[in-house]
From Swiss-Prot:
Quaternary structure and interacting proteins, as annotated: Part of the 50S ribosomal subunit.
Coiled coil spans: none
InterPro entries named in the record: Ribo_uL30_ferredoxin-like_sf (IPR036919), Ribosomal_uL30_bac-type (IPR005996), Ribosomal_uL30_CS (IPR018038), Ribosomal_uL30_ferredoxin-like (IPR016082)
Name of encoding gene: rpmD
The keyword Ribosomal protein appears for this protein: yes
Protein name, as recorded: Large ribosomal subunit protein uL30
Keywords annotated in UniProt: Ribonucleoprotein, Ribosomal protein
Ribosomal protein as UniProt keyword: yes
Family membership: Belongs to the universal ribosomal protein uL30 family.
One GO cellular component, as annotated: cytosolic large ribosomal subunit
């Protein structure tokens, strides 16, 4: 496993379920094409599984 993940919001949260919107917000993403770095751990991976269709993930 890599130490960090680079997460980019690639699809809009308009029309998604409220739980998915909160997950995207919890990841620190607000705007389209915004990128954040998060630690690679089980909690982050779980959140990414819930919104995999909205984000792209790159291991760094």
């Amino acid at each position: 496993m890599a130490n960090k993940l680079e997460i980019t919001l690639t699809k809009s949260v308009i029309g998604t379920k409220p739980a998915q919107r909160k997950t995207v917000e919890a990841l620190g993403l607000r705007k389209l094409h915004q990128t954040v770095e998060k630690a690679d751990n089980a909690a982050t991976r779980g959140m990414l599984d819930k919104v995999a269709h909205l984000v792209t993930v790159k291991e760094i």
